[in-house]
Amino acid sequence: NQIMRGLYDAKDDDLVIISDLDEIPDLEKLKNIKIKKYAIFFQKIYKYKINLLSESEYPWQGSRIVRKKYLKSPQWLRNKIFKRIKFWQFHRHLTNPQFIHDGGWHFSYIMSLEKIKLKIESFAHGEWNIEKFSNIDHIKKQIEARRDLYDNNRILKKVEINNTFPRYILDNIEKFGEFIV
């Protein structure tokens, strides 16, 4: 919640985006929508490689945006307001929720096998921090088979990198070679 300290001079109608580091909101979408109070970016989630899409996890309820005057705290926005609620249940939790469809990208586990292992071993999700899932051979095998690491039957689909991806990736594609299938 230290984010609030950085917002000391923000105006009440300023927009504040709260997002995980691996979630990238598509700011172009804001040109076509007027945020009244708060909204959620429905994002596509890619795992292990930039172009391995987890279709079964769409829409990923990723980045959140709120007018400063309605922001109680970043944690409130993360956990209380948009706590992985099924999209048809939002009306029970919010008045006039807004959704930003195709609202960006969540690039999860886009790192080396060793760093994936370290991430799993450092996880707050203790149920996933077991030898089977953090084993380098298992990680490599699952990625090659285009399957989620955690034996949940999620299949990852290879997609072409095209103009629906972030501009930075398109402009710097050569930097991402090892992270493209």
Predicted segments with their positions:
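Conserved catalytic core of nucleotide-sugar-dependent glycosyltransferases
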Residues: 23-129
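C-terminal accessory extensions appended to soluble enzyme cores
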Residues: 95, 99-181
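Extended interaction regions within the primary functional domain
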Residues: 1-6, 14-16, 43, 140-144, ...
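Active-site-proximal specificity loops/subdomain of glycosyltransferases
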Residues: 1-18, 27, 177-180
